[in-house]
Amino acid sequence: MKSYLRLNNEVLHHYNRTGKLDLAKDREAVRRYFLEYVNVKWRHFANAGEKICFLVAEGYYEKEFLEQYDMAFIEELFQRAYSYNYRFPSFMSASKFYDSYAMKSRDGKEILEKYEDRIVITALYLARGDKELAERAVNAMMTAYQPATPTALNSGKR
């Protein structure tokens, strides 16, 4: 059994016994999940521009909504999202995102999006060329707002 799953099971068993979550163990499960799963499957891109070009060329992203923005703005928006230094608060939230929302390669062997990437693409897609709205959407989604599942899951994807 993967160590992050073992730790998550321990968190759940502890909760069932005591009614309290072992948050230290949960944080360790998140850390191990990234080390043993996400980072291993992550496809590295040199920068946001390279990532966008690859995902459009390979038919993962719709190009039409991205063409409403210049690449400098898109890269700046990615930097803004990453500047929040977002960390998943629990193993369950991280695994739900990477199992259900993050874009993966068609064969499932590579993870193509991180949380911040999905946020930026969703914001760009919904803003339809309005840079100020895209910026506000990234800020809202990185701090509190979560769009409904179909929107978060499908925005910008082919």
Predicted regions located by residue number:
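Extended catalytic cores of very large enzyme megasubunits
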Residues: 1-158
